[in-house]
């Protein structure tokens, strides 16, 4: 339901745990969702602050006006699937995503901090 907040993941397994989610199965996320309204989309990349590729993808999403999840520094798992395997509930993970979703300048600021973690 695109009238509700929709979570966009790279991988289909991650999208299975969060309600109202879609996955692009790799490739360029921004190109895959360019026809969807941005207001209700949250792009959720893997938790890889050391990955130059991931940081570039998040920066591209921010520059294109999307909401992005910037994982908090105390989340050690690489992705939602790993978080579930480590014992976290899908409700808790959704809460973390919702409370760490940013856009525009705040997203840039959080991305810079996350990259230093």
Task: Please provide the spans of the model-predicted regions.
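TOPRIM fold recognition
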Residues: 3-6, 12-117
């Amino acid at each position: 339901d695109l009238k509700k907040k929709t979570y966009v993941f790279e991988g289909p397994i991650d999208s299975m745990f969060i309600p109202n989610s879609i996955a692009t199965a790799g490739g360029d996320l921004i190109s895959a969702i360019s026809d969807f309204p941005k207001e209700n989309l949250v792009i959720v990349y893997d938790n890889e602050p050391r990955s130059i590729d991931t940081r570039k993808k998040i920066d591209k999403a921010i520059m294109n006006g999307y909401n992005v999840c910037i994982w908090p520094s105390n989340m050690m798992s690489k992705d939602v699937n790993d978080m579930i395997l480590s014992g976290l509930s899908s409700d808790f993970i959704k809460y973390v995503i919702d409370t760490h979703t940013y856009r525009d300048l705040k997203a840039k600021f959080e991305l810079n901090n996350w990259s230093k973690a």
